[in-house]
């Protein structure tokens, strides 16, 4: 009986080892298909790899990424929505095993951001931001999550700005209020109350991104945009003009850096 038990254990280990080898083979096939743009085939390979070895984190990450790659932001088809939701689910499964997996944290933050725009979902934007903040908590030296917090804060504050102007125009027919005009005093007060803290957060985080990566031209572009939202909080023309001047300066800096990057040969 003892020998039989030992033999059965050996068989079990052998079967487990074979399954893990098969999982890695399926993973490699999936990676090759993914690199060739054959995403449907890649998904099936990654699924098989995951089934054969549920502990193979790379299979889960690649499966989630393959779903996310096929997701088209704003496309309303049920299949497209299913792709986005499947990506979220797979990234969440990775985080259940390792809550500090940066790749999964970034992946879910990215797909939620893409899913939040159309149809608009404030909840998804906020959830996306929470994942980028998790990245910051784990690796505060990385500039990218600060950038994404700034992008989300601008996206939300810009939408709120347009809505505030639209509501005022409807209530005051015949009175012009252009998108770059100062906000009326009552609208400005409400806008600051609802968005002021978020705008300040975005500006702070984008400046942090630039502190960590001084040539981060995309961060400069969004800092310019958020400073324009900050200008809508200004109570005096001089304060508004100063903020708009700062915004314009970042536009010029971003242009200079982009031009410099274009003129610099890529490293081999």
What is each residue range found by the language model?
Residues 24-70:
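Post-signal peptide N-terminal segment of mature Sec-exported envelope proteins
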Residues 19-21:
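Bacterial signal peptide processing site
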Residues 23, 40, 68-93, 113-130, ...:
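Short coil/linker segments at helix-helix boundaries
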Residues 14-17:
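C-terminal motif of bacterial Sec signal peptides marking the signal peptidase cleavage site
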């Amino acid at each position: 009986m003892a020998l039989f038990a030992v033999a059965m254990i050996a068989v079990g280990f052998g079967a487990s080892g074979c399954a893990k080898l098969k999982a890695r083979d399926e993973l490699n096939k999936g990676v090759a298909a993914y690199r060739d743009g054959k995403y449907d085939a890649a998904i099936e390979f990654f699924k098989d790899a995951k089934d054969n070895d549920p502990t193979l984190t790379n299979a889960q990450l690649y499966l989630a990424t393959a779903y996310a790659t096929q997701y088209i932001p704003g496309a309303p088809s049920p299949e497209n929505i299913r792709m986005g939701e499947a990506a979220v689910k797979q990234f969440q499964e990775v985080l259940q095993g390792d809550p500090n997996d940066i790749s999964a944290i970034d992946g879910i933050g990215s797909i939620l951001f893409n899913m939040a725009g159309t149809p608009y979902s404030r909840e998804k934007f906020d959830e996306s931001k929470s994942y980028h903040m998790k990245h910051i908590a784990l690796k505060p030296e990385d500039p990218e999550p600060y950038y994404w917090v700034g992008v989300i804060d601008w996206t939300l504050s810009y939408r709120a700005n347009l809505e505030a102007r639209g509501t005022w125009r409807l209530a005051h027919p015949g009175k012009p209020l252009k998108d770059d005009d100062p906000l009326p005093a009552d609208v400005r007060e409400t806008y600051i109350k609802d968005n002021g803290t978020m705008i300040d957060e975005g500006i702070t985080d984008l400046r942090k991104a630039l502190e960590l990566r001084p040539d981060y031209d995309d961060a400069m572009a969004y800092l310019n945009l958020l400073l324009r939202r900050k200008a809508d909080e200004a109570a005096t023309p001089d304060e508004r003009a100063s903020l708009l001047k700062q915004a314009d300066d970042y536009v010029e800096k971003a242009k200079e850096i982009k031009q410099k990057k274009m003129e610099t040969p890529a490293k081999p």
